[in-house]
């Protein structure tokens, strides 16, 4: 946990506290900006080691995203750490694995365009457009081996948000036109485009 100094938390946090309510109805106070990973570690090392995500205020959140202030402000945040034993964790694990698969495909088949990679009730998939040839089941062993290598490397997942124009440019710079279409479709669904 970061150290507190006379001007607040050394990592830029404020000295405001946020109350969380655990599944056993225990209420604990944490500095605003605390992450679910830090809360899990405070509960126990074993829990932190197996944590997949968390549920805060009814939404699944990643472990490194600071908790948002509750609404209404004086109420505790209902909070639960998700582990592989929780049904909600399965979708998170499948979503993460789809990202690993996409990265493996991009490494093995440079120039591949990624379309959509949703989770399903049966697992996950990724629609891809390979510039040289269609991918087939014969490619699965190599993709699985590259996925295993990526998982063993334990590279962190990094979530970041960008304003829409920057997000569009980011995926354009990656030459991922289907992702630009996806952003535009989302904007249209909200009546923005």
Regions found by a protein language model. Name each.
Residues 16-26:
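Eukaryote-biased recognition of intrinsically disordered, low-complexity regulatory segments
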Residues 24-34:
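Short, contiguous acidic and Ser/Thr-rich linear segments
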Residues 32-36, 80-118:
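N-terminal catalytic cores of NTP/NDP-binding nucleotidyl/phosphoryl-transfer enzymes
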Residues 34-46:
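Short amphipathic, charge-patterned alpha-helical segments
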Residues 51-65:
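Short acidic beta-strand-loop surface patches of small beta-rich interaction domains
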Residues 61-82:
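Eukaryotic mixed-charge, acidic/polar low-complexity intrinsically disordered regions
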Residues 78-85, 122-133:
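Short, hydrophobic beta-strand segments
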Residues 120, 130-193:
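Non-catalytic interaction/regulatory segments
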